[in-house]
């Protein structure tokens, strides 16, 4: 019944009272009465809630008609319809706006010309026109719908009358249906009465039978009642039947191949078809043309049941006899064979249904198509499906069937959507078990997956080389016993199995992995690739976790790859599944090592994040813009894997990781320099499995070094090639006190050198010489990751300089005492009782930015400079000229240098000893009487402060020999004792001669040995001066100095006493500049050193 839209005034009313204002009241008045829905107008007792009413007699004698049932089903308020339409309009408008927003409108390519009316046509692109059409269509459609609402609104105002019409129509239909039902019942009654009819009785035949006892009209068949059989007669007849059957089967009947197994007994023949049935047949006549008759059948498979008595047994009996009559034994076999095959399929179908409703619920899907049973297993597993089909297989040409051309039950296995051979499936046609069949199929499927995964894993180097082991345990009948054991690391193993019912892969690690690795086990796909991928991921996770836990013990810090993940992935191969970054406090900040793991192998990588000058100071700061400079694989294993039996394997690993960073940084630096030959190249740099850090072999040739790395020597020091050109740089661990990497450079000297090892102090660890050989070793320190190549070249050139100085000293017959890269100590003097130390200094090492290989190759000026110095320990008398000698060593002139310094040491030794003895005091309370001012190594000023006399002692050429010349520079003014001192000087020195010296009238000239006698004679002239001697005006404010009396045993020639030699004084050194050196141009340019005693 269609629904009616009612406005709020009429919804839900069951009946209506008479409305006198209704226009139809007067129109519907007939025969003096008015009826609305079966109620008479003016009836005061009408109950609107009653659906029907039995009429009562009225005053006029008429009965009131019963009230019609009021229909309210399907009525709903008009407001609900309006709300639905409005809501639908709003939703469609929102969808239209979204759709129009997705349409891209192309901009105006050019401004079009305005039409004659001056109005712009707007954007007339196809997209914009399409938008406008969509809006217009939407508006027209909604307008039409709301017009319909308007019509319904107007019509609903008259819904009261329509409701009455509906009630009337419902009444007419119900009466019509009652009429149809009455006709139907009458027809059925007429049909049923036919069976109740009884034929008229045959009274004549009845009277004849009752009177005569027989009916003459019936024919006599001549049957005689048979005699009762005795046991012997029955046995005789059975034997006869047996002979008839045997003769017939042997001579006449064509026996099908499956019926070749039979036995004749008890008057019947029993045909045995293995795995199917036993059939008993017998004959009804001796003729060979008579048919066999069915006696009994027994099924030979389980589960099976006998054919129940009744209709089914009768139908089978009749069907078999018909087949025997029409087709003989062959037709009978074909019928029974097909029946058995169908029965077996139905038995397996019922078992499959029971499994699908039991433990295998939601994992099996069973479908029977004619005589083909389809069982899909692992139904919830995504990807290609797997199922087994059991059906009747034609035996034509099949040698494995029970007979030529005999159908049999066949299996068709679809594994992951592809048909595979089903011969290995365990299926017993005599003992039907769907569960055993499924277990065999699933076991074969699981064995295939695990064996395929095992084959793929065995091809990887980790398993093919025996580093890790794997084992597959397979079973063709029991899927729960199939598993794959994989060794993840030395201490962790993984067992892979597949749940038989659902096909879900189960991964069980021993010991268990962390939670982040267990999330990978949520995948339910068990294809071979996914299975291998999951095993690979777990192996990599286990390897990285085990490595992290052990490496942290060694003091390494894990670096978060949060800001580097995208860039660092480009450094590693695509097959890397897991990696972890480590850093050690003894390394440079821009170097880390990365442990990468994949199913093909594990690797250690050295990664340089960025150049040293650009590295942040803290890894904790997340910098997502850190650029990677380089990365290099240093090993093909995690190194410690092959040393699991050693307890010290991981400490060795810590040593190896630091060595990897240190060696790679230096090889990378050499590779960038390009001008230095080295081995191994950067691409071949590897760490062996025995944790041996490779050494770097460097060809050392100063001439081929970049100009910036060639050491600049002083002009007086000649460069010599004293080292062989092959140097081996080796890593020797970490210095824990200095937190730096230790490098040792091994090399060999050119030519024989003796006693070098005795010259090097045992406390000096920077340089070692091989005893009895030409080998040497240099020790270098630097943080791991900072190259030591510049330091190495600087040390090698310094060593050559040191050996050159040592060779020169030995040529001058000086005795070397000690040797290092910073100094050479040697003994000199007639008795080798004096020692000097030649210091070897280098310029400050430039910053790391200046040492960048790119900048070094671009520079044309040198960065490294060597300076020499000389120092003397107390009481060496040459300490007065120490500064001057150092200036001569580093002078730019080729005439200066070590050769000149050794000559000066020999030439000035008597003078220096005399001055040292004179200026030495017995006690520190004794005042100075002589001031010695050193202008340079060959010019001295002698100042007697008490008397005010100044003398200059210089070198000069005299008679072709180098001599000393003493001259008086100035004299004090007239004062007490001045004339006596003048006279004493003239008498003692100027006009006198002595051992090795001669007076010149206004001075003294002396040879190398005689200058000491001159100094002693000069000092003797002033020894007797008194404390109240006249002092120069400029010295009045100075401290009083008491003179030391000359010992009585001191001779005029200058032989000092032991007491005088034992005196000690305080020396004050002042450095001034003076260019008055008269020895030669070289000496005149040296810096003057003034020593005041």
Curated annotation (Swiss-Prot):
Residues 1-61, 1035-1060 are annotated as: Disordered. The keyword Transcription applies. It is found in: Nucleus. Pfam families: Med14. One of its GO terms (cellular component) is mediator complex. Belongs to the Mediator complex subunit 14 family. Component of the Mediator complex. This is Mediator of RNA polymerase II transcription subunit 14. It comes from Neosartorya fischeri (strain ATCC 1020 / DSM 3700 / CBS 544.65 / FGSC A1164 / JCM 1740 / NRRL 181 / WB 181). The lineage of its organism: Eukaryota, Fungi, Dikarya, Ascomycota, Pezizomycotina. The gene is rgr1.
């Amino acid at each position: 019944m269609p629904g009616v839209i009612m406005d709020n005034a009429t919804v839900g009313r069951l009946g209506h009272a008479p409305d006198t204002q209704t226009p139809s009241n007067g129109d519907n008045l007939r025969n003096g009465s008015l009826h609305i829905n079966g109620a008479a107008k003016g009836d005061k007792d009408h109950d609107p809630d009653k659906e029907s009413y039995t009429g009562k007699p009225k005053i006029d004698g008429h009965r009131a008609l019963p009230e019609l049932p009021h229909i309210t089903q399907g009525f709903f308020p008009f407001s609900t319809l309006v709300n639905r339409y409005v809501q639908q309009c709003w939703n469609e408008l929102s969808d239209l706006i979204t759709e129009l927003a997705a349409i891209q409108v192309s901009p105006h390519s050019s401004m079009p010309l305005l039409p004659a009316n001056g109005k712009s046509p707007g954007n007339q692109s196809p997209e914009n026109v399409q938008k406008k059409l969509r809006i217009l269509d939407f508006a027209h459609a909604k307008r039409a719908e709301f017009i319909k609402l308007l019509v319904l609104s107007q019509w609903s105002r008259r819904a009261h009358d329509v409701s009455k019409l509906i009630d009337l129509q419902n009444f007419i239909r119900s009466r019509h249906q009652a009429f149809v039902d009455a006709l139907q019942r009458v027809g059925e009654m007429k049909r049923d009465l036919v069976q109740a009819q009884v034929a008229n009785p045959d009274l004549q035949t009845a009277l004849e039978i009752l009177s005569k006892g027989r009916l003459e009209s019936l024919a006599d068949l001549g049957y005689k009642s048979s005699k009762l059989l005795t046991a012997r007669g029955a046995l005789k007849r059975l034997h006869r039947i047996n002979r008839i059957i045997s003769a017939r089967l042997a001579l006449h009947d064509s026996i099908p191949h499956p019926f070749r197994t039979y036995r004749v007994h008890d008057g019947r023949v029993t045909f045995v078809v293995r795995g199917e049935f036993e059939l008993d047949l017998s004959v009804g006549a001796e003729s060979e043309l008579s048919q066999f008759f069915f006696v009994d059948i027994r099924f030979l498979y389980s589960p099976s049941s006998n054919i129940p008595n009744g209709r089914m047994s009768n139908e089978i009996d009749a069907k078999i006899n018909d087949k025997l009559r029409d087709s003989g034994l062959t037709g009978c076999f074909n019928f029974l064979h097909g029946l058995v095959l169908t029965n077996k399929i139905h038995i397996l179908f019922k078992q499959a249904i029971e499994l699908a409703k039991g433990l295998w619920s939601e994992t099996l899907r069973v479908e029977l198509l004619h005589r083909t049973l389809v069982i899909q297993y692992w139904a919830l597993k995504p990807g290609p499906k797997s199922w087994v089909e059991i059906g009747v297989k034609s035996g034509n040409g099949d040698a494995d069937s029970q007979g030529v051309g005999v159908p049999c039950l066949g299996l068709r296995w679809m594994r992951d959507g592809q048909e595979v051979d089903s011969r290995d499936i365990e299926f017993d046609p005599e003992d039907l078990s769907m569960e055993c069949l499924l277990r065999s199929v699933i076991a074969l499927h699981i064995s295939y997956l695990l064996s395929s995964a095992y084959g793929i894993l065995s091809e990887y180097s980790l398993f093919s080389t025996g580093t890790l082991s794997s084992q597959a345990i397979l079973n063709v009948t029991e899927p729960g016993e199939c598993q794959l054991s994989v060794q993840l690391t030395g201490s962790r193993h993984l067992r892979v199995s597949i749940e038989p019912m659902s096909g879900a892969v189960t991964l069980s690690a021993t010991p268990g992995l962390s939670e982040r690795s267990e999330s990978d086990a949520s995948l339910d796909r068990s294809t071979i690739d996914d299975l291998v991928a999951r095993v690979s991921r777990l192996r990599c996770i286990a390897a990285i976790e085990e490595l992290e836990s052990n490496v942290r013990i060694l003091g390494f810090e894990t670096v978060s790859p949060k800001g580097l993940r995208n860039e660092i992935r480009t450094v590693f191969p695509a097959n890397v599944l897991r990696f972890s970054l480590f850093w050690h406090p003894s390394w440079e900040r821009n170097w880390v090592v990365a442990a990468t793991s994949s199913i093909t192998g594990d690797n250690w990588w050295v990664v340089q994040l960025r150049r040293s000058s650009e590295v942040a100071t803290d890894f904790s700061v997340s910098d997502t813009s850190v650029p990677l400079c380089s990365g290099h694989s240093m090993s093909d294993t995690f190194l410690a894997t092959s040393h699991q039996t050693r307890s010290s394997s991981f400490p060795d690993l810590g040593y190896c990781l630091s060595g990897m960073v240190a060696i790679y940084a230096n090889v990378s630096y050499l590779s960038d320099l390009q001008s230095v030959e080295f081995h191994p190249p950067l691409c071949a740099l590897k760490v062996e499995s025995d944790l041996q850090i490779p050494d770097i072999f460097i060809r050392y040739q100063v001439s081929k070094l970049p100009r910036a790395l060639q050491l600049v020597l002083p002009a007086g020091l000649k460069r010599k090639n004293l080292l062989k050109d092959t140097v081996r740089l080796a890593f020797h661990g970490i210095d824990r006190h200095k937190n730096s990497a230790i490098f040792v450079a091994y090399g060999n000297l050119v030519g024989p050198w003796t006693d070098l090892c005795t010259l090097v102090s045992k406390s000096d660890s920077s340089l070692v010489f091989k005893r009895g050989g030409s080998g040497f070793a240099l020790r270098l320190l630097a943080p791991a990751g900072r190259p030591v190549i510049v330091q190495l070249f600087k040390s090698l050139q310094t060593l050559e300089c040191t050996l050159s100085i040592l060779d020169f000293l030995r040529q001058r017959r000086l005795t070397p005492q000690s040797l290092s890269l910073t100094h050479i100590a040697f003994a000199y003097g007639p008795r080798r009782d004096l020692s000097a130390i030649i210091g070897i200094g280098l310029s400050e090492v430039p910053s790391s930015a200046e040492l960048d290989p790119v900048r070094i190759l671009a520079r044309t000026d040198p960065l490294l400079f060597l300076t020499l110095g000389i120092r003397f320990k107390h009481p060496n008398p040459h300490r007065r000229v120490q500064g001057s000698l150092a200036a001569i060593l580093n002078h730019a002139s080729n005439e200066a240098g070590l050769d000149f310094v050794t000559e000066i040491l020999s030439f000035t030794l008597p003078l220096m000893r005399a001055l040292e003895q004179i200026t030495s005091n017995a006690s520190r309370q004794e005042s100075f009487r002589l001031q010695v001012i050193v202008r340079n190594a060959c010019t001295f000023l002698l100042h007697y402060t008490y008397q005010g006399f100044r003398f200059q002692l210089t070198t000069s050429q005299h008679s072709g020999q180098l001599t000393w010349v003493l001259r008086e520079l100035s004299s004090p003014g007239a004062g007490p004792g001045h004339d006596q001192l003048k006279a004493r000087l003239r008498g003692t020195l100027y006009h006198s001669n002595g051992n090795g010296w001669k007076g010149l009238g206004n001075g003294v000239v002396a040879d190398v040995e005689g200058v000491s006698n001159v100094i002693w004679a000069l000092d003797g002239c002033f020894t007797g001066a008194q404390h109240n001697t006249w002092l120069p005006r400029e010295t009045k404010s100075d401290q009083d100095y008491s003179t030391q009396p000359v010992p009585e045993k001191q001779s005029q020639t200058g032989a000092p006493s032991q007491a005088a030699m034992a005196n000690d004084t305080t020396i004050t050194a002042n450095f001034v500049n003076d260019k008055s050196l008269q020895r030669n141009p070289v000496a005149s340019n040296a810096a003057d050193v003034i020593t005041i005693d």
